[in-house]
């Protein structure tokens, strides 16, 4: 029984005195205050709430239209993803209907260079469908029993994203990046244990196909005696992404090998308007180092092309949450208007192409360009405006301090 030395009773859970709460309820061995009762009631109510159903009624065209608002370019990949996701959740909606035909999952593999939009596509899909989303890096995963993350830790991230609502988590999306980094070292089976390559692929097999996994709510190895949460992966959509550097050579070698005799003129022609990666076949990925069983569980494969200057220019200005809009909002909070010349934006896009970082490199360039302006926004403002010109971007490339010129009024754009 909770009683202080002075004889005042207190809550056995939070420790608050009788005088500090509205009501203190007595039990045989303990007291509980009204605040703790309300808190416990809220927790129980949350657990009993039905899981959010998500927007599973969207048609492929509607899904792509929303993707278009956030992801610029990659039209074919957006179409492929929209259809795959629609079919996956259509299968889920009709899971209770008895059918002679069992429809397998539409797990997806996105192949494309850094900064082409793989992660953004997966994240946007989850937002469109209003389902829990978790992201993992394949390079941190190892086989169970070795130093590193277990595959079950990915499911834990999804559970956390769903606020430990198991039903909601079982309809979520998991994106695993850098999957090309877990390719086995050679095409032949290795005698030595490959715990971060083929071993991880083997560990992922059952999870991505569909199984009931025991997930440690506190993260696994550090808490061996905790109770596990059972989660079915039958309806979790897995999306994998990777750059697959060197896959082009494998595709071209296959293409040359099959281009013999009568069919040579037909088969050896790779369309100059299409990226080589768009011709990837499962056999190419096996040669790259993914095991056949792993590839067999990912039926949908699509490639994302490298973004050119014009596309990167559009990435800067067109999406709902474009970088230009984000930085303009930050300056607006200081009662300033941020303006970019079109030539300045094209110069930023050109710099990202030169760095070979795709859309991901745009933010780093913008940060470098605007650092001094954000440090002293009023010092470079002219009549409440901060204007960025092409010359400023070019001076950044040359390592010059364009902020001083802007403050003197020498480099103001046409804003």
Swiss-Prot record:
Q: Which GO terms describe its cellular component?
A: HslUV protease complex
Q: Which residues bind Zn(2+)?
A: 11, 14, 33, 36
What keywords were assigned to this record?
Answer: ATP-binding, Chaperone, Metal-binding, Nucleotide-binding, Zinc
Record-linked CDD domains: RecA-like_ClpX (cd19497)
Superkingdom of this protein's organism: Bacteria
Q: Which Gene3D superfamilies match?
A: 1.10.8.60, ClpX chaperone, C4-type zinc finger domain, P-loop containing nucleotide triphosphate hydrolases
Q: Which family does it belong to?
A: Belongs to the ClpX chaperone family.
State the oligomer form and interacting partners: Component of the ClpX-ClpP complex. Forms a hexameric ring that, in the presence of ATP, binds to fourteen ClpP subunits assembled into a disk-like structure with a central cavity, resembling the structure of eukaryotic proteasomes.
Give the function comment from the record.
Answer: ATP-dependent specificity component of the Clp protease. It directs the protease to specific substrates. Can perform chaperone functions in the absence of ClpP.
Name assigned to this protein: ATP-dependent Clp protease ATP-binding subunit ClpX
Q: Which organism is it from?
A: Anaplasma phagocytophilum (strain HZ)
Q: Which gene encodes it?
A: clpX
């Amino acid at each position: 029984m909770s009683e202080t030395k002075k004889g005042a009773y207190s809550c056995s859970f939070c420790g608050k005195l009788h005088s500090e709460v509205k009501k203190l309820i007595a039990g045989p061995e303990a007291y509980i205050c009204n605040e703790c009762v309300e808190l416990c009631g809220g927790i129980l109510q949350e657990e009993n709430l039905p899981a959010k159903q998500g927007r599973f009624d969207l048609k492929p065209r509607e899904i792509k239209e929303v993707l278009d608002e956030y992801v610029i370019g990659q039209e074919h990949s957006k179409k492929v993803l929209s259809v795959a996701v629609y079919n996956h959740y259509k299968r889920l909606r009709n899971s209770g209907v008895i059918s002679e035909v069992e429809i397998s999952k539409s797990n997806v593999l996105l192949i494309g260079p850094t900064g082409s939009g793989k992660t953004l596509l997966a994240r946007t899909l989850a937002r469109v469908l209003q389902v829990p989303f978790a992201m993992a890096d394949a390079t941190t995963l190892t086989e169970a029993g070795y130093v590193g993350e277990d595959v079950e830790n990915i499911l834990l991230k999804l559970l956390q994203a769903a606020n430990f609502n198991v039903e909601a988590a079982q309809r979520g999306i998991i994106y695993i990046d850098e999957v090309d980094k877990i390719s086995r070292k050679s095409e032949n089976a290795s005698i030595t244990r490959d715990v971060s390559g083929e071993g991880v692929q083997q560990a992922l097999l059952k999870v991505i196909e569909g199984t009931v996994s025991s997930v440690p709510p506190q993260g696994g190895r550090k808490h061996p005696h905790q109770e596990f949460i059972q989660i079915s992966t039958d309806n979790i959509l897995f999306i994998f992404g990777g750059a697959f550097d060197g896959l082009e050579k494998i595709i071209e070698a296959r293409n040359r090998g099959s281009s013999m005799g009568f069919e040579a003129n037909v088969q050896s022609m790779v369309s100059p308007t299409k990226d080589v990666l768009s011709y990837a076949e499962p056999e190419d990925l096996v040669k790259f180092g993914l095991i056949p069983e792993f590839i067999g569980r990912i039926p949908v494969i699509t490639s994302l092309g490298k973004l050119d200057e014009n596309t990167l220019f559009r990435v800067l200005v067109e999406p709902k949450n474009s970088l230009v809009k984000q930085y303009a909002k930050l300056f607006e909070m200081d009662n300033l208007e941020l303006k970019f010349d079109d030539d300045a934006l094209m110069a930023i896009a050109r710099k990202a192409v030169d760095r070979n970082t795709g859309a991901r490199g745009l933010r780093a360039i913008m940060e470098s360009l605007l650092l001094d302006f954000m440090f002293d926004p009023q010092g470079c403002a002219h009549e409440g405006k901060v204007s960025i010109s092409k010359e400023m971007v070019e001076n950044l490339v040359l390592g010059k301090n364009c902020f001083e010129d802007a403050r003197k009024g020498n480099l103001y754009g046409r804003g």
